[in-house]
């Protein structure tokens, strides 16, 4: 099946009169409805099959990708296919933007030839083809549409998932590479929407289907020119299966993008690994298929397998903090892909990933900037709007990108269209404007905000311009920009919402909501935040609810909605909110924690259910002591004493170094010790051993808390460690007697007397017990007891001698004579 060739007939450009379609042109233009009516009323719609419409839709989609992402420039002016009355540039652009706006979210206005995207979408919708391949391409279109919007929108997400679900039932009949390609695309979609756990599973499944073996491991090697010894380095070992068909895709390509050498006086161009195979990880831990891989001379990868490595790189970034360790883990994946230039698009993406990673190091930042500039120039040259006099998408202020690199000669480093598009859907490739905006964001991260501002102004990304002005504390300029642009386009809902943020005025949120016909979810979300900060939680929940009706994929909205519900004691609403948060991101420990808190107070849920929810939370917030503290308290309530001990240990590990004994929850520790002493027959039980290890961590932290020494003394006494028990009691007394308030505060004096009498009692009970090194614990226990009492009596004489506690000391001393 081939695409329809006569586009003027297809899209109504040959119409001499459009009076019968006036309803679609006034008061505003609705291109999709016009085309639907046109196709229904003309023989064309009846004589052309739905498959031909779908094939034409695929053609339009690839035209759009070619003009915005991959190049080379396509000198086709799609608006000439439309009726004459639709060809006014400004009016047509507004109509296209309006048709591509979803849930109030607009695509980038200056994206060249957006009409291709709209025509593709309209053709797919009209065709309604049942062919799995066409449904797959429709899902690809929807995902590309989503990537052009600022926020995730549920309408497109649902369409994508529905289409991919239909295709998944037919995938098993395809060859293994197509199965792997489909699974990889599904993984990228899930990762884009923040579902990285599922995405990771899909990527592993894709590798398994394609019989692609790879592993991140360690090998001995050298990173610098003057290094005299080998150290452990991360490396990705990967091997593609032998494909039967030796097609062009498996051969190296000479049409690779410009690649820059590092040219550093210290760092090697790439890591030099030790030639000895023993430098790799132990063979029993390594996939046998990879054991023959040489890190210095790896085998050539299939482009599809290389795409999968880059997809894994993307998931690692999403799953980990944005820090040096994460970048070190990502780098070997990109380096493995860059060994051989097997495909232009794959190689371009690998260079971009490496440039992103190298922008954070002083020795590699120069190559990072040069490489990113080269990739920008490559797109700028190949997507140049000025090549054809018929290009109508060139903005008036588009002066092109400034470059300090020489321009390539015509045809230099130019790949075929087929090579560029072949793996596009398996790579999250940025468009020209997205790449330039990314460069501007890099400038912001290093403090060059003014340079970023210039780029955003040239791209007419006014929301980013506003944010730059605000970061420079020039809110006045930000407001000027917003008001100027709103005069040109009153329906820019995002700018109107930003104006509300800057002026802290809710009327702008309301205006954005009303102008969007109550479809722009961020307006209600911002209004909800406004009321939340003011403390009007009920009104905030109402606003969040309106926002979530439009966009239920917004994790921040669900989370804040849940927090407001918790504060208002609406526990069912809170549970729903945090459950939705977890459906979006199952690894969000804070949502698990809040869900458990709501379950604890809800009528229809047990503490056991809350405990299980909290148990999930600590998996993902392992270093958060507050989460562990909550888990500890719930574990006490449900009598999970081993988990109480585990939580106490973890809290001490996190806080002990900075807070010392304050990191220990004395009450929980006391409860655990009591439980172990009552329920365990001896100190050989598992729980007793766990408690013993815990107390080994507690004892070095104790400085001034008498309660802790008393707990330790009681536990050692139960274990029949008499000397240790007596020593703990003595240390508790020393803390009391060292207080400067013993002679001035009667309460302190009474506590000290109590401690002294406890110590004397311990001497009497334990002094004659067997000691650690033979003999008894304290042979002279009476002498030591008298010394303790005399010392304390001497301190209290003339101050507390008329008190009852003082009389107790004298009486006890008399008994010891």
Curated annotation (Swiss-Prot):
Q: Which PROSITE patterns match?
A: TPR, TPR_REGION
Q: Name one GO cellular component term.
A: nucleus
Q: Does the keyword Transmembrane apply?
A: no
* UniProt TPR repeat ranges: 459-492, 521-554, 555-588, 625-658
Under InterPro entries, the record lists: TPR-like_helical_dom_sf, TPR_rpt, TTC27/Emw1
Q: What keywords does the record list, in alphabetical order?
A: Repeat, TPR repeat
Which stretches of sequence are listed as region Disordered? 276-298, 386-413
Mind telling me what this protein is named? TPR repeat-containing protein C19B12.01
